[in-house]
């Protein structure tokens, strides 16, 4: 006996979306991020770098530490924006968050590739960073649309400052890493501006200070581990 669709196009075993599907989708997304499966939609910025003399071992270690920090930042960005979007009830805001997360995938892939070029690896604590950031994103979204967008804007503002510091600290000879960080900084500025235009409000000073403290903890740990 065979089972066939009717002339109306009805499929008797078509799958209906269940209440746990969004959860399964987020778990799948997390596994893809943490497994290093991300691929960029845009060209690799480092490809445009001029050939330079080889880096010394010390320069490579320092550059790898900084790029590992940047990679952790992109893991956190994926989790943060997915968490914010998951709890957001405003469709336009949710789309803005998901669009930013999609662009950050490029950054994730670029940092991962550069770490490989430098003979290094991502942070061993990435699962912890992801889980914490996703939870933080959900909490930010529960604070309301204006604060949710304000959190996005403040996050990007602090990331811009952090990337500025990396541009000052990276070896001048490491033009490949510098090209990547420069492009990332430009993208973060656009994300911040988008959040502000969409209605993001400034966060209270204690919240901004707590965000900076958490960022310092993450960066100082990820540089080594």
Swiss-Prot record:
Coiled-coil residue windows: none
Residues the record lists as binding Fe cation 1: 74, 104, 107, 188
Pathway linked to the protein: Cofactor biosynthesis; ubiquinone biosynthesis
Known catalytic reactions: a 5-methoxy-2-methyl-3-(all-trans-polyprenyl)benzene-1,4-diol + AH2 + O2 = a 3-demethylubiquinol + A + H2O
UniProt: Fe cation 2 binding residues: 104, 156, 188, 191
Keyword Iron in record: yes
Topology of the protein relative to the lipid bilayer: Peripheral membrane protein
UniProt key word Cell membrane: yes
EC number of the protein: 1.14.99.60
Keyword vocabulary terms for this entry: Cell membrane, Iron, Membrane, Metal-binding, Monooxygenase, Oxidoreductase, Ubiquinone biosynthesis
SUPFAM superfamilies from the UniProt entry: Ferritin-like (SSF47240)
GO terms for cellular component: plasma membrane
Molecular-function GO term, any one: metal ion binding
InterPro entries per UniProt: COQ7_proteobact, Ferritin-like, Ferritin-like_SF, Ubq_synth_Coq7
Required cofactor(s): Fe cation
Biased composition (Polar residues): 1-11
Basic and acidic residues: bias regions: 184-195
Listed Gene3D superfamilies: 1.20.1260.10
UniProt remark on cofactor binding: Binds 2 iron ions per subunit.
Subcellular location: Cell membrane
Segments of this protein annotated with the region Disordered: 1-20, 181-203
Family affiliation: Belongs to the COQ7 family.
Function: Catalyzes the hydroxylation of 2-nonaprenyl-3-methyl-6-methoxy-1,4-benzoquinol during ubiquinone biosynthesis.
Name of this protein: 3-demethoxyubiquinol 3-hydroxylase
Source organism (scientific name): Bordetella petrii (strain ATCC BAA-461 / DSM 12804 / CCUG 43448)
């Amino acid at each position: 006996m065979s089972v066939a669709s009717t002339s109306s196009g009805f499929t008797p075993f078509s799958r209906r979306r269940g209440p746990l599907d969004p959860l399964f989708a987020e778990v799948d997304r997390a596994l893809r991020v943490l497994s290093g499966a991300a691929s960029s939609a845009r060209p690799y910025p480092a490809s445009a770098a001029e050939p330079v003399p080889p880096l010394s071992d010390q320069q490579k270690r320092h550059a790898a530490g900084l790029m590992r920090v940047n990679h952790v930042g992109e893991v956190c960005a994926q989790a943060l924006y997915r968490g914010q979007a998951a709890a957001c009830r405003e469709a336009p805001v949710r789309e803005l968050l998901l669009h930013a997360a999609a662009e950050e995938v490029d950054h994730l892939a670029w940092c991962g590739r550069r770490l490989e070029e430098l003979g290094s690896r991502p942070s061993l604590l990435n699962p912890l960073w992801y889980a914490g950031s996703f939870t933080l994103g959900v909490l930010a979204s529960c604070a309301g649309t204006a604060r949710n967008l304000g959190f996005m804007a403040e996050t990007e503002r602090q990331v811009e400052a952090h990337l500025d510091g990396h541009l000052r600290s990276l070896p001048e000879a490491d033009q490949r890493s510098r090209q990547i960080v420069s492009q990332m900084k430009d993208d973060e500025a656009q994300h911040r501006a988008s959040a502000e235009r969409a209605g993001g409000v400034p966060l209270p000073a204690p919240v901004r200070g707590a965000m900076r403290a958490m960022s310092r903890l993450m960066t100082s740990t990820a540089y080594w581990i």
